[in-house]
Amino acid sequence: TYEQFLDTHARHYNPSNSYITLYGDLDVDRALAFLDERYLSQPSAASRRMDAAVAAGEDPSTLAPNPLDVQAPVTCEYKRIEMATTPENALVGLGLVLGSALDRKRTIAADILFEALLGSNEAPVKKAILAAGLGGNVVSYTAAESMQPYELIMLQNAQPGIARELRRVFQDACRDLCEHGVPRERLEAIISSNEYDLRQRDYGIADGVAIACDALSTWLYDDDAA
């Protein structure tokens, strides 16, 4: 409802629930003083609502931002969603939780590993899935900017009823690589490419925005070192 929309906006979009970044060659003390005078030291609508709730004997937590809790991994055997599209547009996905947003090394390592396994038609796991004739193409994506980073593997132009078979082929291919190893040259090439990208930070946006987004990917989840 409209009232729920207003309530959600008041809970989350206010200075007490904000993250502020400063970037560039500026007078930090002057910038902070300006922010404090204009915004941070002034009672916000959210704080006034909270004070009114306390004065009325109400539970102030009902006006606080909604909590974001870590969820236990869920093993979903099979979930099907019907969509109004042609069969050629069918997608089958496989998602894997990588850990915590605070474990950046693990997330970067997982991104490198999945690039080695699925990043090209010659990548061993992608090659195995395509050879099985389950669909037209395989793409993977590492979602690192969340509380629980995850890897999403998607099979495009999927054949009917192959969801469980996709999981089996994926797991068998990974099991084989655990026994025989991932080609060292491939891993070294991907590590070098990732190192270059991380150093260059060429994301097509302003440097300050890129750095702020990178910091927020863990700062939002209580990483004081961000």
Which sequence ranges carry the predicted segments?
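Charge-rich, well-structured scaffold segments of protease-associated domains
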Residues: 1-65, 82-109, 115, 121-226
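Membrane-proximal cytosolic interface modules of multi-pass membrane proteins
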Residues: 77-80
